[in-house]
Amino acid sequence: MLFRSVKVAVRYNPNPARITEPLYKVEELEKSPLYTVLCGGKELTVYHTDSFDYVIPVVDDDSPLSFQVKVSKDFQKAVFRPAKTNVQAQISGRELSFQLEKPSKVTLELDGNLKTPLFILCTKRVPKPEKVDHLFESGKVYNVGTLEVKAEETVFLEEGSVVCGCVNAFFAHGMRILGNGILNGCVWHPKEENGGGRPMIRMVFCDDVKIQGITMVDGGSWHLVPGACWNVEIEDVNIMSRVCTGDGIDIVGCEDVTMRNSFIRASDDCVCIKAASYPDPAANRRSEERRVGKECRSRWS
């Protein structure tokens, strides 16, 4: 009997080398070589990964927005999603001009190429509250490892800040994670790793939780995970993952969870509601369980 050796392409390295060099400056985050974006005539930073590019216009109100997108290579067709936004672009050579009647989260695809989308993720400005326990300032990079959040604490990411690491909360009633900065996982898991690392935000046994305005990018595993929590509000959050197990939001054994006006790009589950055997002392309490999603956008790739 004749056997042939067959080479199998492995997408992910099962034993990747660990990353030893953290990010030191915001400028070190890779910028898009394909897209330049202007909003109201002002150039915005367009970030790049090997799976998508993204830009985060932070806005103060619901006024219309005018955009110009300059593309560094020729293209034949441009499509905006979701289709119901009905974006009508004027195309001149490699440049597109269009207007959003109100701030929204849209995707630009060129020539049907799903590997080079541009995510335009308009996000409302989140004002800094008077009480902030963990402040991450604009223009700075923070390598936090695991940030432990306690009850009644507020985490605030200013626009232009980049936080590398993950957030963990246990019995952190009244916790808040707010702002318009970026929680980025690219430097604490290897690019080709699948299923490695910890959830980017993990909350267990927490009540009265609010996550608003932040952008989460390229975690090594699940991104936003409330477990055995109740009264959770997720608003205007952007989540973009690359790895195969990079779920967007996993709601595990929770009560009264509301998601609104958020964007999720995932290679696995965008939003997944799960059950788990948490020893919840409130398990026998009579309660109406609600999980509500309003004006959210999801994209599976």
Predicted region positions:
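Beta-strand-enriched, solvent-exposed domains that form extended recognition/catalytic surfaces
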Residues: 3-131
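Extracellular beta-strand-rich solenoid/capping regions of secreted or surface-exposed proteins
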Residues: 96-98, 141-154, 162-178, 186-209, ...
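An acidic-aromatic substrate-binding cleft motif
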Residues: 124-147
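Short glycine/acidic-rich loop motifs that flank beta-strands on beta-rich extracellular proteins
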Residues: 144-146, 164-168, 186-191, 219-226, ...
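Short, small-residue-biased leader/transition segments that mark boundaries at the very start
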Residues: 1-2, 293-296
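All-beta strand scaffolds that present successive hydrophobic residues in beta-strands
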Residues: 136, 149, 155-158, 176-179, ...
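Active-site-proximal loop/turn and secondary-structure-junction residues that shape catalytic pockets
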Residues: 228, 238, 253-255, 275-277
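A structural signal for beta-strand register positions
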Residues: 159, 181-182, 187, 215, ...
